[in-house]
Amino acid sequence: EYACDTLLLSCGLIPENELSRELGVKLNPVTSGPVVDESLETNVPGVFACGNVLHVHDLVDFVSEEADRAGTCAARYILQENQSSNPGIDQESQYSDSDIGKASKMNDNNDPVIPLISTGCVRYTVPSAIHLSKMPDKLKVRFRVGKVVKNCAVDVYCNEENSEKRIKTKKRPVVAPGEMEEILLGREELLKYP
């Protein structure tokens, strides 16, 4: 028991994205936030998203970390004379059944783009796609699950010519919808697969 004067509850948060809609930013139907790549850039060149506008966070530490990454990538974008980090990406691929099974696509610059496809209990991932040429050595992928699961493993697979190869596994005693999860992907791990 804790003595207190006020209890504030934050329930059922939905990201506010009126400005994103006006700009033509594609929104994730699960999070109601923008669909982003590894740089946290949206489908609109030069528009980056982070924090609770992207997806609801549990901890301000995650928001700060994400804001730092988005700010760094936005500064890099400006310094590269406004060259988009994601030209030609089809960021709706996460939601298209026809894209399941494709390990990667090429954008207009022949840059391999890997769509992250949520399956099983995983409801969504941030980012939704990875450009290998822009990916750091290690990339934190955050996600939420749709139900409580005990004694489980989070597996990352690469689909390669109609076969799946597990490239990463992370055992968890329990996962729950109310707690954001994360898994670290290595660039070298992904470069091994076409």
Descriptions of predicted regions:
Residues 29-32, 57, 69-72, 164-165:
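Short, surface-exposed linear patches
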